[in-house]
């Protein structure tokens, strides 16, 4: 990661602290992975507090593939099997079958409908029958032990939520440029500065968790 591009957001640890502070308030955090991996930035919100306005931001400025990052425990509770039997994706992204709230939504596509689906999935009393398949929200199963086990945005979302005292679930979407191409670090920094988002890298989160044994 080109650290010079992130200098305005502070040191590695300062970036994590700022990200945790803003996430605790229910605000979004922009998480960047390694330039040799996906080289993308995901805007992430806590699943249990996400608003329709925040979801609309993800849809407006993201790829449109809004994902709900959750633990294996919740996947099992909701009986969400893997999307495919043999995962051949480069980064082994653990998609499950897609979901839609069984009640309270229309077509499931709008920002409000997707928020409803997310809230239903992470509710304390959630059960398999609360969800229909397929749907317009894409659950992702996080690796146990988070970014220390897999340096992905899925794990970063769950780690951020857990570290902030939320249920271990986050809503993410990759940020894109206006022309539809993927936003890279320079564009992501400009995006964060324009909208006032905290920026943190997965490398930052790994270092923080390792240092403080969290």
Swiss-Prot record:
Residues where Mg(2+) 2 binds: 38, 153
Assigned EC number: 4.1.99.12
Residues the record lists as binding D-ribulose 5-phosphate: 37-38, 42, 150-154, 174
Site (Essential for catalytic activity): 136, 174
GO biological process: riboflavin biosynthetic process
Entry GO CC: cytosol
Superkingdom field: Bacteria
Entry binding sites for Mg(2+) 1: 38
HAMAP family named in the record: RibB (MF_00180)
The protein's role, per its UniProt record: Catalyzes the conversion of D-ribulose 5-phosphate to formate and 3,4-dihydroxy-2-butanone 4-phosphate.
The protein's name in its UniProt record: 3,4-dihydroxy-2-butanone 4-phosphate synthase
Source organism of the structure: Mannheimia succiniciproducens (strain KCTC 0769BP / MBEL55E)
Lineage: Bacteria, Pseudomonadati, Pseudomonadota, Gammaproteobacteria, Pasteurellales
